C-alpha cells in the first residue's frame, strides 16, 4: 500500500521516537494510517468527501489528501488544529485537508455533504483531551453517550446516497 505508516506515525509524534524505537508513553493514541488508507480505498470514492466529526490528530486528514480524497474534520482544540496544519504542511498531500475548530454539534451543519463519514471518537474518559465542558472525554459516561450519538446522527445527515443502474446514468440521489 502507501507504505508511510511508520513515517506518518513518527511525524504525528505518536508511537515512535525519531530513531524508530517504540515510545513508552501515556499520551493519547495515534490513528493507524494503514487502517485509514484501507478504509478510504475500500469505502470512499476517488475524489470523494470524507467527514470526520472527531478529527483529533492529522492522520485521517493527511491520508485522505494523499489519496486524493477531500477531508473535512472538526476538533474542539485550537492547539490540535494548529499542530495538524503544521504536519500537513510538512507532508504536503496533493489535496489539502480542511480542519475546523469547534464543537461538531455546531459545526457539522456547515460541513460539506459526505461520501464517507469516518472518525475515531473519544473513548469516554479513557483518554482525556481537555477540561472543556463540550469535550466528550470530560463528560460522565451517560452524557458522553448521548452527545456521541447526537454527533454521529448529525454527521450521517451530511452524507448523500447514490444508486446507479447497470446501463444508465445515476438514477437517484437522496439524503
Can you say where each PLM-predicted feature lies in the sequence?
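Class I S-adenosyl-L-methionine-dependent methyltransferase catalytic core
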Residues: 1-175
Amino acid at each position: 500500500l502507501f507504505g508511510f505508516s511508520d513515517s506518518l506515525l513518527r511525524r504525528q509524534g505518536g508511537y515512535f521516537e525519531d530513531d524508530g524505537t517504540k515510545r513508552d508513553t501515556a499520551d493519547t493514541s495515534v490513528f493507524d494510517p494503514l487502517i485509514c488508507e484501507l478504509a478510504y480505498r475500500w469505502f470512499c470514492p476517488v475524489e470523494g468527501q470524507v467527514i470526520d466529526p472527531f478529527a483529533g490528530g492529522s492522520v485521517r486528514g493527511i491520508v485522505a489528501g494523499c489519496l486524493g480524497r477531500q477531508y473535512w474534520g472538526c476538533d474542539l482544540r485550537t492547539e490540535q488544529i494548529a499542530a495538524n496544519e503544521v504536519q500537513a504542511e510538512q507532508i504536503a498531500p496533493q489535496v489539502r485537508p480542511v480542519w475546523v475548530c469547534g464543537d461538531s454539534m455546531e459545526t457539522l451543519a456547515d460541513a460539506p455533504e459526505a461520501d464517507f463519514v469516518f472518525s475515531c471518537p473519544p473513548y469516554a474518559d479513557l483518554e482525556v483531551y481537555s477540561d472543556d465542558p463540550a469535550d466528550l472525554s470530560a463528560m460522565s459516561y451517560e452524557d458522553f453517550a448521548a452527545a456521541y450519538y447526537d454527533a454521529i446522527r448529525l454527521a450521517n445527515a451530511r452524507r448523500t446516497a447514490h444508486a446507479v443502474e447497470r446501463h444508465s446514468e445515476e438514477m437517484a440521489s437522496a439524503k
